[in-house]
Amino acid sequence: SFEKKEVLRDIDFTFDEGKIYGLLGRNGAGKTTLFNCLNRDIKTDSGNFYIDTDGVRREVTADDIGYVLSTPTVPEFLTGREFLKFFMDINEKSIKNPKSIDEYFEYMSIEPEDRDKLLKDYSHGMKNKMQMLINIIAQPNILLLDEPLTSLDVVVAEEMKQLLRSLKQNRITIFSTHIMDLALDLCDEIVLLHHGELEVVEKTDLDSKEFKDKIIAALREEGNE
């Protein structure tokens, strides 16, 4: 809650490994707040988050989380290569089966001539790729994506969608958006953040008008409060 306003309440939900969940809600519905609670950036008034690893249930820690922001945050005084080297050096003990820096660049389709440029000279899409790349290297158990495709051009956005589909195994991926068509295109399951609670919207037919109308009605209802 913020200043006595309850943003999230009574959330009791299970996310399964190997799926991309679309967290759909209006702007201001609390999607980023939920992510910040999961990431421990915001302290919850009550409740806990748990994860099952190797058959053992335990509380989620910051080490479990990879967080891709809608506005990429990168150290602009470093080159792309320096940034990756720095990240890999400080996380050396936790990175499983590391590749070479150039292999990672190839994986993200970052051209050789761009790899030694300062990050401040990267486009928004390239900064977003770098932010995504460090989360790929870290291999988190839970990947949170806070509207990361909203301001990307069509080509980069499509590359990122294909990448997310290829990475979804062995982790929980939660993709927040207020754009319904994007959620339907990318995600395996749709979860509606509505009145501060999470609700699964059944996807019996992704193209059905009834399905879309149900989501729109719920979002409109929340907006009229």
Predicted stretch roles:
Residues 24-26:
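The feature captures the beta-strand-to-loop junction immediately N-terminal to the Walker
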